[in-house]
A protein has these predicted regions:
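Trimeric beta-solenoid/beta-helix "fiber body" segments of extracellular/virion adhesins
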Residues: 1-127, 143, 156-158, 164-167, ...
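Extracellular receptor-binding modules and their adjoining Ser/Thr/Gly/Asp/Asn-rich linkers
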Residues: 36-37, 97-101, 109-278
Length: 278
């Protein structure tokens, strides 16, 4: 602990240092200045820390305000996590991003990730894919985990199979979709009950706020068939599911059945063509 004055943080500061084993030369790791601002040893600027609201203030034109870095070469965790105790709701945002007007840094909302899983943007969503796809289940289950990208498919009830000559396919198994609908990337799709139109059912529950008051809030109704002990495997990694590109630019195996309105764009290789599916 160093209480001696330092540049720009008079009359004193709190410095946290460590030494190597049996060493005598301490190395600074972090410091807090007289105003309660904090910085780590390798940071260029202080950040303000408040019990109710944590802020990282950067008054430089080009420096990053916040950087999250994972340095382990085998990192397999989550780089940035936000957890909110309240049940899923439209009444709060998990993350929001703002732009300013020269004086107010929160003048306009540019991105919102709402507490019910909905996302909003004032501009574009840019992706490397070129088609819109939805997940469908194979009628044969694809138990051999066959690579079926580029195959045209038709519906069999609510499932799919390869299209036969003379049939009108609904789309093509996509290898690089821009958007994938009917995904279950966050949890088992049936974890919460829905009505006939696919909207979540909700129920009242009581919670206690920070002041000790009991408040009534709403949450989704848990499916009694949900088993939290079972590992959730996303449809992306299950062989019985595939993303069917329903519109956009798609790669199709040569010789596959095509729709009457589809337009061939080019040959990608000796075995693959690119078509505009519409």
């Amino acid at each position: 602990v160093d209480a001696s004055p330092g540049a720009n943080d008079l009359p004193g500061r709190l410095v946290f240092s460590t030494t190597a084993d049996e060493g005598n030369s301490p190395s600074e790791r972090a410091r807090i200045n007289k105003d309660g601002y904090f910085k780590s040893s390798n940071a260029a600027d202080y950040v303000s820390v408040d019990q109710a609201q944590h802020e990282f203030n950067n008054n430089h034109a080009s420096n990053n305000s916040l950087t999250v870095r994972a340095t382990h070469s085998s990192f397999a965790g989550t780089g940035f996590t936000v957890g909110i105790k309240r049940s899923s709701s439209q009444l709060y945002d998990i993350v929001a991003f703002y732009s300013g007007n020269g004086t107010n840094a929160y003048s306009d909302t540019e991105y919102r990730f709402r507490g019910d899983g909905s996302a909003f943007a004032d501009g574009d969503w840019n992706t490397g894919g070129a088609d819109y796809a939805e997940n469908f289940e194979w009628s044969d289950g694809n138990s051999s985990n066959e690579d079926r990208r580029g195959i045209s498919v038709v519906l069999v009830g609510d499932k799919i199979r390869e299209a036969a000559e003379g049939e009108d396919p609904i789309g093509v198994i996509s290898g690089n979709p821009s958007v994938v609908g009917d995904s279950d990337g966050t949890r088992w799709a049936g974890k919460y009950l829905r009505d006939d139109y696919g909207t979540y059912l909700s129920e009242d529950y009581e919670a206690t706020d920070d002041e000790g008051n009991t408040v009534t809030q709403k949450r989704r109704v848990l499916n009694p068939d949900f088993d939290p002990s079972l590992e959730h495997v996303e449809r992306e990694f299950r062989p019985e599911w595939s993303p069917v590109g329903l519109m956009g630019k798609l790669r199709i195996r040569k010789g596959q059945v095509t729709g009457a309105r589809w337009i061939k764009m080019r040959d990608v290789s000796a075995t693959v063509e690119e078509w505009l599916v519409r």
